[in-house]
Amino acid sequence: MKSAVLVFPGINRERDMARALKLVSGNDAAMVWHAETELPKGTDLVVVPGGFSYGDYLRCGAIAARAPVMDAVRKFAADGGLVLGVCNGFQILCESGLLPGVLMRNARLKFICRDVHLRVERNDTPFTQGYKAGQVIKVPVAHGEGNYEADEDTVKRLEGDGRVLYRYCSPEGEVGESHNINGAAASIAGIVSERGNVLGMMPHPENHVEDIMGCTDGRGLFAGLAQHLAKAA
């Protein structure tokens, strides 16, 4: 698996992401500066990590979405390449037009930093094949604007097409208002593009890949990607 991790001013999770990718794949990720106009040759996974790109000015991800490197990412995605956006990366993908909807202020207007539970809605995608369908995993969140919103038709289309891959839930897998940490429409924590090759999610799976962290539930996402790409090679 040859990964490229994008780096924007204000991003602060790129090293965490690169470490997770190496732990699972055994390969170093290329760190790609936002001013680059091309991705490294042979890249088969692009990751847009979390943080506060450009200080979250204008809107979260709005400035980063217009960086030169994002033209290369859009082309990469159009050609079928796998793209993963986490937290601020999810916001950037939405602002870039690679995913529908927008991430708004959390419903209670407070920054949330804690572990949450997610239900894996399906496991027949590159981003979920490391889990079982319906499996509940625990991963951290750290965001102030993670409230996913889209118009009613878009949400219905996402649901109908099976494009909601991760959903906030209880430890037992129950979905409801009391388990929806940020007010996201339909308890959405992660969605995939129409072609299924671009995933955006607010939680941070890269922070739960090592035993020392007390939980390795995030490892399945990266292991599934590595398995998928190994088969495709």
Swiss-Prot record:
Q: Supply one GO molecular-function term.
A: ATP binding
Q: What does this protein do?
A: Part of the phosphoribosylformylglycinamidine synthase complex involved in the purines biosynthetic pathway. Catalyzes the ATP-dependent conversion of formylglycinamide ribonucleotide (FGAR) and glutamine to yield formylglycinamidine ribonucleotide (FGAM) and glutamate. The FGAM synthase complex is composed of three subunits. PurQ produces an ammonia molecule by converting glutamine to glutamate. PurL transfers the ammonia molecule to FGAR to form FGAM in an ATP-dependent manner.
Q: Which Pfam family, just one, is annotated for this protein?
A: GATase_5
InterPro entries assigned to the protein according to its UniProt record, in alphabetical order: Class_I_gatase-like, PRibForGlyAmidine_synth_PurQ
Q: Which domain of life is it from?
A: Bacteria
Q: Where in the cell is it found?
A: Cytoplasm
Keywords per UniProt: ATP-binding, Cytoplasm, Glutamine amidotransferase, Hydrolase, Ligase, Nucleotide-binding, Purine biosynthesis
Its predominant location is cytoplasm
Q: From the UniProt record, report the name of the gene that encodes this protein.
A: purQ
> Per the record, what are the reactions this protein catalyses?
N(2)-formyl-N(1)-(5-phospho-beta-D-ribosyl)glycinamide + L-glutamine + ATP + H2O = 2-formamido-N(1)-(5-O-phospho-beta-D-ribosyl)acetamidine + L-glutamate + ADP + phosphate + H(+); L-glutamine + H2O = L-glutamate + NH4(+)
| Matching HAMAP family | PurQ
Q: What is this protein called?
A: Phosphoribosylformylglycinamidine synthase subunit PurQ
Q: Name one GO cellular component term.
A: cytoplasm
Alphabetical list of NCBIfam families matching this protein = FGAM_synth_I, PRK03619.1
Glutamine amidotransferase type-1 domain span: 3-233
Catalytic residues as annotated in Swiss-Prot or TrEMBL: 87, 204, 206
Q: What is the lineage of its organism?
A: Bacteria, Pseudomonadati, Pseudomonadota, Alphaproteobacteria, Hyphomicrobiales
* Gene Ontology biological-process entries: 'de novo' IMP biosynthetic process
Annotated pathway, please? Answer: Purine metabolism; IMP biosynthesis via de novo pathway; 5-amino-1-(5-phospho-D-ribosyl)imidazole from N(2)-formyl-N(1)-(5-phospho-D-ribosyl)glycinamide: step 1/2
Q: How does it assemble?
A: Part of the FGAM synthase complex composed of 1 PurL, 1 PurQ and 2 PurS subunits.
Q: What is its EC number?
A: 6.3.5.3, 3.5.1.2
What species does this protein belong to? Answer: Rhodopseudomonas palustris (strain ATCC BAA-98 / CGA009)
